[in-house]
Curated annotation (Swiss-Prot):
Lineage: Eukaryota, Viridiplantae, Streptophyta, Embryophyta, Tracheophyta
Keywords: Calcium, Metal-binding, Repeat
Organism: Arabidopsis thaliana (Mouse-ear cress)
Annotated Ca(2+) 3 binding sites: 111, 113, 115, 117, 122
Name the record gives this protein: Probable calcium-binding protein CML34
GO molecular function: calcium ion binding
InterPro entries assigned: Centrin_CML-like, EF-hand-dom_pair, EF_Hand_1_Ca_BS, EF_hand_dom
Gene3D superfamilies attached to this UniProt entry: EF-hand
Amino acid sequence: MSAKRVFEKFDKNKDGKLSLDEFREVALAFSPYFTQEDIVKFFEEIDVDGNGELNADEFTSCIEKMLKEVFVFCDVDGDGKIPASESYVTMTSLGKKFTEETSAEKVRAADVDGDGYLNFDEFMALVIGDI
C-alpha cells in the first residue's frame, strides 16, 4: 500500500483532505505510542498552508517524515539499514503485535534485494503495508 492509498483509506468523508481527527487515526495506526501532543505537533508542522487540513502532498510528506524518524531511531549504527534479524524489535517498538515468526515473514517479503537488511524504502513499504 502506498502513502496515497493510506490517505484515501483514512479520508473518511472523501473530501480530499484529512482533518486532525482523521490524521489522529492514521498516526495511531502507525504506532499506538504517539501521544495526542505528538500528533497535534506533527499535524501543525506538516499543515504547510495552515488551513487546519492536510492535502495529499502534505500527508505524503508527513508519512515519510514520521517513518524516517522511526527508521533513524532503529538504525542504531547509522549505516542506513536495519538488520532483518532485528525486525521483531523494530516492529514491536512501533506497537505492532506480531509474533517473531510473523515479523520475520513480513521482513523477508519486504527485503526486496534479499541482502538481509531493510533500507528506508523497504522499511517504509513494510510499515505502510501493515496499515
